[in-house]
Amino acid sequence: MYKLLKMHTEKKAESTILLNKVKDPSRFGLVKMDNNNQIISIIEKPSIKQAENLKINSGFLIIAGLLILKNSIFDFIKKTKPGLNKETWLTDSVELLRQDKKNVFGYELKGTRYDIGTFEALKEADRIEQDKKDFS
């Protein structure tokens, strides 16, 4: 996470988001970046049509659950309208921050990341890790 924090500091970012590439973005916040890692679009739990517009190569960049944020985010949270199920999503607040021309960057995680957002995904991640260990 040192590289994530270093990027955040060097770019004088308002927000820096850890990203991961996946094939199915339907359960996640999805982003698109430019060549300088500046985020140019963010959407929470996109429809298939919305997601297709953000596809890169053979996958999608999703928010991997870690965001570095400055205190200014609280002003944007107050302006964020509730979305699906009347929830206020931090992703929508960060999108407002970005639309206000604040520096929002993404850092793509290299390596393995396990989604544990559902019980089934948690069990699968645990099984994979258990298989890696030698308990003899």
Question: What is each residue range found by the language model?
Answer:
Residues 1-35, 68-69, 78-79:
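Conserved beta-loop-beta/alpha segment of the NTase-like Rossmann-fold superfamily
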Residues 9, 38-114, 119-136:
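Catalytic-core segments of class I nucleotidyltransferases/pyrophosphorylases
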